[in-house]
UniProtKB/Swiss-Prot annotation:
Domain PTS EIIB type-1 stretches: 425-506
Record-annotated PTS EIIA type-1 domain positions: 547-651
Cited Pfam families: PTS_EIIA_1, PTS_EIIB, PTS_EIIC
Record carries keyword Hydrolase: no
PANTHER family registered for this protein in UniProt: CYTOCHROME C-TYPE SYNTHESIS PROTEIN AND PTS TRANSMEMBRANE COMPONENT, PTS SYSTEM GLUCOSE-SPECIFIC EIICB COMPONENT-RELATED
Membrane spanning stretches: 16-36, 59-79, 81-101, 126-146, 170-190, 211-231, 273-293, 303-323, 328-348, 355-375, 378-398
Protein name: PTS system glucose-specific EIICBA component
Record's catalysed reaction(s): N(pros)-phospho-L-histidyl-[protein] + D-glucose(out) = D-glucose 6-phosphate(in) + L-histidyl-[protein]
Length: 675
């Protein structure tokens, strides 16, 4: 029960990142516009008082402000897309649900435009609808409901006379119905919830604000490894606390209040739950990176320098800390606890110094300049001496503890072989043993990239053993294990099934090819090779592919391809090496030795070949642009979670992969180069 709830919370936290990612762009527009309208910048640059410049500044402020004014609908759309695997139908359903919910609540409560004049009654004008103000929480609820409707009904089958409304078209219909029903209990119970949130947040701040900001910083940092920090900070940033703007509207949430006060040029009272990040991200963590570099073994310092410089710059400029934090989190968890304590103390220190700083994305230098220095509404310069002190503390604490406890931070690892030597014929037996034996197997399956096993007891699975046998990654979702063995996954599954049934009793009877289990093919002799688009469509970053195996590069680097036609073509001159039985994936090797996997859609293995027609055979030579596969795009859109098609280099090793800066492509467009 707990594991299932934890997994759902992680998914929600990740989904919140999509709407949050919009805020930096809005904040940039707002910050620049506000700075040009402010007296501080006008004093040094008097020419910006020009009417045309001020008109542009006003438009910039308005363009940024409109995003913050409509955060509830943005969160509804973003959460729906995030929880539905990126499908736009969920966003349409969320929009339908959002307007129906607000219209129905407004009508049920008899909210009229006249009642909006008193903001204390909890009413607001939402997209032109006089209704009950549910804020960002209301948007998140609608987004989650839309995603539930999508995941529940996207492949529903209806009688033939209602066939037009089957599949994804049924999702907005269900969302309209459920949001209409939801409006009545929401209208009744939400005022009580809102009053409770207000009382809690105001009581928290009034009783001991210093303790509150310390605990916020400390707990938020501790939740990062679990991916739950987005859920934790959302109420503080978007709901807790209130402030009345010049128009008499009640603004809720520390971040929203900060942005509104910056926009109006008002006295700053907000930022308590944001400002503590600046000394840590701009000074503390980069100093920790220096300590990690200096404690690395001499022979590893060159590699560690590259890693730490990149991570430190990322933290300093943007406030993105995960690349640096995850370099020591798992090998030295005590260091991370110390880091969390220092983070909380940073919040407390800036609160005691009466500094009021905020951000739209994170506590990096970019936000520090745009929303701290340029508006010049608070003692922003105090961050610098506090940050210098923090840099000294982080450096010496990290260096001392790393050496004292011999933490295996980057560059200090013990040398050891990462792959167990095993014959190809023995591999299925060893994998079965690592999965806990045949008694532990509840369900066995595979696709072209991974072995999918549902086990009875996850504690019996030897994850490290699976990796030592050649798995490039192991995903754990409840009792479902996914071991990434690449193209040999289906062969391993086939032999494991026969071992379990008793048809195979010794390694010599396995069918897995010897060459498949050898060490990865080396590519030292590969000459520069251009890889072309596998069809007409759009290129997206691999990180946006809604499947961790691909987005986290467990299979290798590459891109995501969103096809807009029903034909997949060869990306280079070469040979077809593998066609999966369900035809949803194809492996190719270029004449120069580059191996590429084209995985058409996400979870399309479950379609059992429906919607795919192979035009080539295994071991058949192909030329760049030659059709490989016909796909029924509409069928895939209706029955697969996503049509995004990862195109992966599976034998890159130490070669350099350059991804071209292109978006809309056709088969004659180069998308990657490896050399």
């Amino acid at each position: 029960m707990f594991k299932k709830l934890f997994g759902q919370m992680q998914r929600i936290g990740k989904a919140l990142m999509l709407p949050v990612a919009i805020l930096p762009a809005a904040g940039l527009l707002l910050a620049i516009g506000t700075a040009f309208q402010g007296e501080a910048l006008q004093h040094y640059l008097p020419f910006i008082k020009n009417d045309i410049v001020q008109q542009i500044a006003n438009m910039l402020t308005g363009a940024g402000g409109i995003i913050f004014d409509n955060l509830p609908i943005i969160f509804a759309l973003g959460v729906a897309i995030g929880l539905a695997g990126g499908d736009g139908v969920a966003a349409i359903a969320a929009f339908v649900g959002f307007i129906i919910l607000n219209k129905t609540m407004g009508a049920f409560l008899h909210v009229t435009p006249d009642k909006l004049s008193d903001p204390t009654n909890g009413y607001a004008n939402v997209l032109g609808i006089p209704t009950l103000q549910t804020g960002v929480f209301g948007g998140i609820i609608i987004g989650a409901l839309a995603a539930w409707c999508y995941n529940k009904f996207y492949n529903i089958t209806l009688p033939s006379y209602l066939g037009f409304f089957a599949g994804k078209r049924f999702v907005p219909i269900m969302m309209a119905t459920t949001s209409f029903i939801l409006a009545f209990p929401m209208a009744i119970i939400w005022p009580t919830i809102q009053n409770g949130l207000n009382a809690f947040s105001e009581g928290l701040l009034d009783s001991n604000t210093g303790l509150a900001v310390f605990l916020f910083g400390f707990i938020k940092r501790l939740l990062i490894p679990f991916g739950l920090h987005h859920i934790f900070h959302a109420p503080f940033w978007f709901e807790f606390g209130s402030w009345k703007n010049a128009a008499g509207e009640i603004i809720r949430g520390d971040q929203r209040i900060f942005i509104e006060q910056i926009r109006e040029g008002a006295h700053l009272t907000s930022g308590k739950f944001m400002q503590g990040e600046f000394p840590v991200m701009m000074f503390g963590l980069p100093a920790a990176a220096l300590a990690i570099y200096q404690t690395a073994k001499p022979e590893n310092k060159k590699v560690v320098a590259g890693l730490m410089i990149s991570a430190a710059l990322t933290s300093f400029l943007t406030g993105i800390t995960e690349p640096l934090e995850f370099s020591f989190l798992f090998v030295a968890p005590f260091l991370f606890v110390i880091h969390a304590v220092l983070d909380g103390l940073s919040f407390l220190t800036l609160y005691l110094l009466n500094v009021h700083l905020g951000y739209t994305f994170s506590g990096g230098f970019i936000d520090y300049v745009l929303l701290g220095i340029l508006p010049n509404k608070t003692a922003w310069w105090l961050v610098i001496p506090v940050g210098i002190i923090y840099a000294v503390i982080y450096y010496f604490v990290f260096r001392f503890l790393i050496v004292k406890f011999n933490y295996k931070t980057p560059g200090r690892e013990d040398k050891k072989s990462s792959v167990t030597t095993t014959s190809a014929s023995q591999l299925p037996f060893d994998v079965l043993k690592a999965m806990g034996g045949k008694e532990n197997i509840k369900h066995l399956d595979a696709c072209i990239t991974r072995l999918r096993v549902e086990v009875n007891e996850k504690s019996k699975v030897d994850v490290a053993g699976l990796k030592s046998l050649g798995a490039s990654g192991v995903l754990e979702v409840g009792n479902n294990m996914q071991a990434i063995f690449g193209p040999k996954s289906d062969q391993i599954k086939h032999d494991m099934a026969k071992i379990i049934s008793g048809e195979i009793t010794k390694p010599s009877e396995t069918t897995i090819d010897e060459e498949v289990s050898d060490d990865p093919v080396h590519v030292e002799d590969i000459v520069e090779t251009e890889i072309y688009a596998p069809g007409h469509g759009e290129i997206i970053p691999l990180s946006e592919v809604p499947d961790k195996v691909f987005s986290e590069k467990m299979m290798g680097d590459g891109i995501g391809f969103v096809p807009d036609s029903g034909e997949i073509v060869a990306p280079f001159d070469g040979t077809v090496k593998t066609i999966f039985p369900t035809k949803h994936a194809i492996g190719l090797e270029s004449d120069s030795g580059v191996e590429v996997l084209i995985h058409i859609g996400i979870d399309t293995v479950k379609l059992n070949g429906e919607g795919f027609e192979s035009l080539v055979n295994t071991d058949e030579p192909v030329t760049q642009g030659q059709p490989l596969m016909k796909i029924d795009l509409e069928y895939l859109k209706e029955h697969a979670p996503s049509i995004i098609t990862p195109v992966i280099i599976t034998n890159q090793e130490d070669k350099t992969l350059t991804i071209e800066d292109v978006k809309q492509v056709d088969p004659g467009k180069a998308i990657m180069t490896i050399k």
